[in-house]
UniProtKB/Swiss-Prot annotation:
One of the record's GO cellular component terms: cytosol
Gene3D superfamilies (alphabetical): GroEL (3.50.7.10), GroEL-like equatorial domain (1.10.560.10), TCP-1-like chaperonin intermediate domain (3.30.260.10)
Compartments where located: Cytoplasm
Family assignment from sequence similarity: Belongs to the chaperonin (HSP60) family.
Sample GO molecular function, one term: ATP-dependent protein folding chaperone
Quaternary structure (record): Forms a cylinder of 14 subunits composed of two heptameric rings stacked back-to-back. Interacts with the co-chaperonin GroES.
Enzyme class label: isomerase
Keyword Membrane on entry: no
Keywords: ATP-binding, Chaperone, Cytoplasm, Isomerase, Nucleotide-binding
GO BP terms: protein refolding
Superkingdom, natural source: Bacteria
Record InterPro entries: Chaperonin_Cpn60_CS, Cpn60/GroEL, Cpn60/GroEL/TCP-1, GroEL-like_apical_dom_sf, GROEL-like_equatorial_sf, TCP-1-like_intermed_sf
Gene: groEL
Entry protein name: Chaperonin GroEL
Amino acid sequence: MAKDIYFNEDARKSLLSGVEKLSNAVKVTLGPKGRNVLIDKKFGSPTVTKDGVSVAREIELENPFENMGAQLLKEVAIKTNDVAGDGTTTATVLAYAIAREGLKNVSSGINPIGIKKGIDHAVNLAAEKIRQSAKKITTKEEIAQVASISANNDSYIGEKIAEAMDKVGKDGVITVEESKTFDTTISYVEGMQFDRGYLSPYFSTNKENMSVNFDDAFILIYEKKISSIKELLPVLEKVLGTNKPLLIIAEDIEGDALAALVLNSVRGALKVCAIKSPGFGDRRKAMLEDIAVLTGGVLISEELGLTLETVEIEQLGQAKTIKVDKDNTTIINTGNKEQIKERSELIKKQIEDSTSEYDKEKLQERLAKLVGGVAVINVGAVTEVELKEKKHRVEDALSATRAAVEEGVVPGGGSTLIEVAMYLDTIDTSKLSYEEKQGFEIVKRSLEEPMRQIISNAGFEGSIYIHQIKTEKKGLGFDASSFKWVNMIESGIIDPAKVTRSALQNAASIAGLLLTTECAITDIKEEKNTSGGGGYPMDPGMGMM
């Protein structure tokens, strides 16, 4: 296919035009007075959102060169969302500001490589300053403040997230689901829950809700299938002597082994229940090891030289409470706290080393089941459109809150970026080249843009207020929702440090790519043949009658 090629100024101008269009669509959502964006869907009702990354994801431009610029900027929003969970609009505004100011300098003949070096130098100093300025958050109230701001100043959502995080801990899993009612509620699952139910309803001890409820029970954790009752007899006899219930977890239990267990359960000879192992493949073995650690038992595996016939009562796990229904099993643990902590640290290390988002998610779930449990926020709303928008906000707020717990918080509303710009003013740049100094200055000017946009969305002129902030004492900022000068931290207007830092670093990265682009290549669209010509071609041998 033939290609269209733009060089030099033409390439950069076209890319910047696309960046500007996407930035204009996204920046209107910034701040407490940010506006909604309505997104058409081919099927169903349109989506209403104030989420920058949701707007960015939807944008495709007709001009292929402009579209390339827009897609680069979209990458800023998506990457920031993936890393920090919020700050996508801030990142977009910063990236456009750095690219716009940088391209002015490139157009005047300044070497873009030198400009990029200066930008990188300033951003590295700024990122370190943000890290140093961060204040650790510890209280439930501070967590609620962060969550409320990220949920577009919805204090109810903020309180629900803080409540969930307080219950399950910072390593616990909090999931967001759609509620079947109009209300937003939280439900909790203590201990370890996994999606495996009983192998036979005849195991149930509560006939009303068809569930198995055991207290102070033993757990046999076996890696392979069990098909013969003879293999199980030795361990069953040992458990029978203790008069305690037994939960059997194995790859599968079939044949006369399952039949004998059901018969014993129905007759009341032994309180027993059998379930299949959770997970698949390598993950199955890891989850069985988690259950063993959680319950203080041993995974009975031939690799370790252990067989069913030789199992001792000390090798069985123990649980305070076990609940099994047709779909799920919940185990409330009594395991060794030290062993659980060691296992948790191992999983945290695996999360850090993993490059797959799917693997990270599964490891995080395993960690939560070990240390705290799972909280589910059920989001309710009156209409489907409102439900989608609200669920987006809750997910954003949850991600931002996790980022805040991880790296701490800084004053919000763009005031931290202004303070960082003032800090960069104090840096000695005499050893930098002329081009690098220009790049350094570009970052300083661009750091004002997010606050300027927040104030603009509130209906005021940003430049006046930015000048005033620079002369006020540290920590003061403009509250765009109440139109007052306030101490940002004391007023609860805070941003996660990780969000602010990631937004700046990702913005500078993509802006640097735009500045150093000298050529852009895209496919030439083929014109579709619109000439008539329906019907069959005439046979050349056929003449007119």
